[in-house]
């Protein structure tokens, strides 16, 4: 299933971020928790049906973080929930899940090949990379014999893709950006009494990073737009509220 998206991985990435939002509302919200409770089962089923392992990993990492942020004693819930899902899940889901740990799985073999290809590209072009959108064009030049696919559109790994396309300095800047963002969000989480938005943003970052080790989600425009909304909403809302108050005050002064 891919919903209304062009690819099932885009769809699963968006579902992963929505799950972050719903779980954060359930754990940290004091009101309006009915709708996330109602949609959570549908979100979990929809994400499971995509058979997208990177999104499963990202969602689990994000939910685990939210449990820890709420109360570290809740961390034991995650393996219990996963165990229940595995028990009640259909055979196709279980097979897809267990294939994650099978080094002989064709999909996994191709991922190993992509890591090798990306490393060679970085070795040959460490400063500026091979250039934006050039990875698929040069793929066959670096492709090892054991690779499954003749060409892949990207390397299915965010840090590796950035380094291969744009060089190690660009990767360093990206790491600095994510580290600064995470530090700022955690600081806001500790300071603010209403923690829903900051918890959602932190979960979105962790989900992106965990899933991004197996998928180039940072280069997916639909995923990136929702991700950026979630991580900046915490800062944008107070600014919007201040502007609204200022406009309201100006309107009152101008009224006869």
Please report, for each region that a protein language model flagged, where it lies by residue.
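Short "domain-exit" segments at the C-terminal end of structured domains
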Residues: 252-256
């Amino acid at each position: 299933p891919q919903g209304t998206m062009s690819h099932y991985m885009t769809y699963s990435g968006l579902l992963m971020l929505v799950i972050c939002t719903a779980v954060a509302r359930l754990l940290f919200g004091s009101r309006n928790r009915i709708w996330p409770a109602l949609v959570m089962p549908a979100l979990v089923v929809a994400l499971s049906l995509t058979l997208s392992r990177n999104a499963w990993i990202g969602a689990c990492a994000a939910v685990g973080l939210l449990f820890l942020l709420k109360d570290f004693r809740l961390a034991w819930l995650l393996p219990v929930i996963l165990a229940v899902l595995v028990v009640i899940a259909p055979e196709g889901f279980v097979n897809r899940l267990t294939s994650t740990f099978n080094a002989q799985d064709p999909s996994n073999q191709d991922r190993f090949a992509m890591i090798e290809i990306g490393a060679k590209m970085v070795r040959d072009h460490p400063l500026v990379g091979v250039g934006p959108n050039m990875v698929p064009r040069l793929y066959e030049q670096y492709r090892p014999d054991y690779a499954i696919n003749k060409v892949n559109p990207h390397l299915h790994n965010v840090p590796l893709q950035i380094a291969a396309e744009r060089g190690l300095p660009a990767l360093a800047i990206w790491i600095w950006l994510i580290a600064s963002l995470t530090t700022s969000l955690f600081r806001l989480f500790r300071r603010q009494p209403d923690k829903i938005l900051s918890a959602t943003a932190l979960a979105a970052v962790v989900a992106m990073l965990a899933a991004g080790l197996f998928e180039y989600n940072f280069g997916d425009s639909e995923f990136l737009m929702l991700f950026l909304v979630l991580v900046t909403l915490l800062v944008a809302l107070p600014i919007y509220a201040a502007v609204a108050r200022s406009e309201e005050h100006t309107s009152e002064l101008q009224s006869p």
